Amino acid sequence: MTSSSCPRASLNYRPAMKASDVDPDAEYAVPLEHFDVEVSPYTVFERGGTCVRVSGRRLACLLRNGSRGESAPAPAAAAASAGQPGRKRSCKNVCFKGATSRRELERTLTARVNLPPCMTGLLRQFEIRNRGDRYRKRFVFNCYLINTTTCTACDRRCFVNAAAVLYERDEKCVREMMSLLRREDCYKPPNCSKMSQESLCFKSGACRGTNPLCNF
């Protein structure tokens, strides 16, 4: 499920909040990057998939136990990193906030990025199943996505929603994307030769260069 059906609106979580500031009887919309929150099929996403709905009692417990995301950047640091030369300037600006299905996600992506056949092939395989001999394929696609696209509107928070849509809100798959997003320098996908050895590349005349990143 992608949004709450509860009529009561969630309160906004503030990074400066302490456990004593939390109303235990309220519900809060908490950005995923602020806490190491376990995502499950029952997790309620809000704000276009950038936040999860958390009860006040659980939020107070998270604050008391120091369960904040270790790699979550401060707002000022995030804004500064967005303007660093070479980090995002060469990426295509894409926002996945409105994507609610795999087809919508793919249309949003391909409208801005010229996907090489190997990445299109991975998308087709994810339609069949997300898990079961798919970890390496998810890793390669996630790395490609992070290295070729960015979102200046929400500093890539919508990428968590993209992973939730693409991988059918599978907890493990979504956390893999979150882990890569927290890295200062994300891994790059393997070169075309390595992709071919792993049966991830089927060589097309439409490709250029020696790495999938050359084709966007």
Curated annotation (Swiss-Prot):
What the entry lists under InterPro entries is as follows:
Lef-2 (IPR004283)
Which positions make up the signal peptide? none
One GO biological-process annotation of the entry reads:
viral transcription
Kindly name one Pfam family recorded for this protein.
Baculo_LEF-2
Q: Where is the composition biased (Low complexity)?
A: 71-82
Region feature Disordered, mapped onto this chain: 67-88
Keywords from the named record: Transcription, Transcription regulation
- Superkingdom of the source species: Viruses
- Function text: Required for late and very late gene expression. Specifically required for expression from the vp39 and polh promoters.
Question: What family name appears in the similarity comment?
Answer: Belongs to the baculoviridae LEF-2 family.
Q: What's the protein here called? A: Late expression factor 2
Q: Which organism is it from?
A: Lymantria dispar multicapsid nuclear polyhedrosis virus (LdMNPV)
The gene from which this protein is expressed is LEF-2
